Amino acid sequence: MNERLANEKISKLLLSLAIPSILAQMVTLLYNLVDRIYIGRMEDGALAIAGIGLCSAIITIITAFTNLFGRGGAPLASISLGADENDQANKIISNCFSSLVLSSIVIMIVLYIFGEEILLLFGASANTLSYAKDYLNIYLLGTIFVQLSVGMNYFINCQGYAKFGMLTLVTVSYTHLTLPTILLV
């Protein structure tokens, strides 16, 4: 366990753990914004943006599973680490990792099979369905990586390594920001 968590003042710890997490979330927001800028500049940009909007509800559901296992498991692991029950903490982390992988696979399979029907249920029209399906299928390819990077990041943070956690998300976000620039421009 990180000794800082046991010895430093709470106010200093709070800032040192919160600021990197806030910055990581801001960078994540930035790459979502950049996606929309690139897509909005397409020939049918308005329809494509509407397609992304339809996928937002599905992505929120995927994020809920990520948070279930990441945000749900990290405090339990943190409590175990604080009680010097490292074996218990390792079991919690392993179970959450496995749950993230399994839920990713199930989500991907379900959405590849029923994605079109779900998008129609969420209000897709003939004009927006193809854009929504394309975006969703591309997003699904990275679902397992997104769930693992975000979900396991909570465990990095709960051990007191918020700067490292921020760097992992910033690295992923930077890659996501630069690839469209390289591939689309």
Residue ranges of predicted features:
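Residue-level signal for short hydrophobic patches within transmembrane helices
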Residues: 11-30, 58-65, 141, 167
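Small-residue-rich hydrophobic transmembrane alpha-helices
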Residues: 49-109, 146-165
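Interfacial/gating helices of multi-pass transporter permease domains
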Residues: 39-60, 127-131
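Conserved small/polar residues in nucleotide/adenosyl-binding loops
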Residues: 175-181
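Hydrophobic/aromatic residues in alpha-helical transmembrane segments
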Residues: 35, 73, 114-115, 152
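Generic alpha-helical transmembrane segments of integral inner-membrane proteins
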Residues: 22, 26, 30, 34, ...
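Short alpha-helical transmembrane segments in multi-pass integral membrane proteins
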Residues: 1-18, 77-144, 177
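Hydrophobic/aromatic residues within transmembrane alpha-helices of membrane transport systems
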Residues: 23, 35-39, 52, 77, ...
